[in-house]
Amino acid sequence: LSVEPRPAFYALGGGGWRDYVTLLHPPYTLWHLSYVVIGAALAPSLPVERLAWGLVAFALALGVGAHALDELNGRPLRTSIPNGVLAVTAGVSIGGAAVIGLVAAFAWTAWLLPFVAFGSFIVVAYNLELVGGRFHSDSWFALAWGAFPVLTGYVGATGTLRPEAILAAAFAASLSLAQRHLSTQVRDVRRRATRISGQVVYKDGREEAVVAETFTRAPEAALRAMACAVVALAATLLALHV
């Protein structure tokens, strides 16, 4: 008897409230919220209130809104959350994040305005695969989910851009690109593969059957470790301001 694999290693089965937890993609949401912390923590003096509001905005737009749109667009997580609930959740979350960004721009620095505009656009364009999926690519993921949170966190904290922020954004973009490459293979196996077969024969005569875990075990272990590493790095930089 074959058992259908979970759509993601962090997916909870059973429906109900578990679907809403799964929808948040917990390890990835923490990962990308950590980029906001990293950006803000590069500031000479960390304005805690600005960081807190930045985290709330990204938690709404990325953690909730983006993932609700993604689930609305093809049900990759196979949740039972109604379409209407997903649509309203996405609209309220992304709209709330945009309002926070606009208020912050007028209260702190106008340099946040282009970041609010870009974030509001890319969260919809990427997850709904608008313009024929042109924005749903590895490079756009690296920029939007990696570099963008770092730069926004830094600009929100300082009102300017400096070389250290650009370098940190390059770090986040590169790491997010690695995340994308690893997770793409895992998603293909978990969500699209209907049959996997084969055998690995080693030089010493050992034989090993090729199963789904052959393609998911190592990438998922790497993704878990990378998520923990980014969160730890963000916490370390934050601790420097305590």
Outline where the language-model segments fall.
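Membrane-helix interface "capping/anchor" motifs
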Residues: 128-140
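Hydrophobic alpha-helical transmembrane segments
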Residues: 1-80, 85-123, 143-242
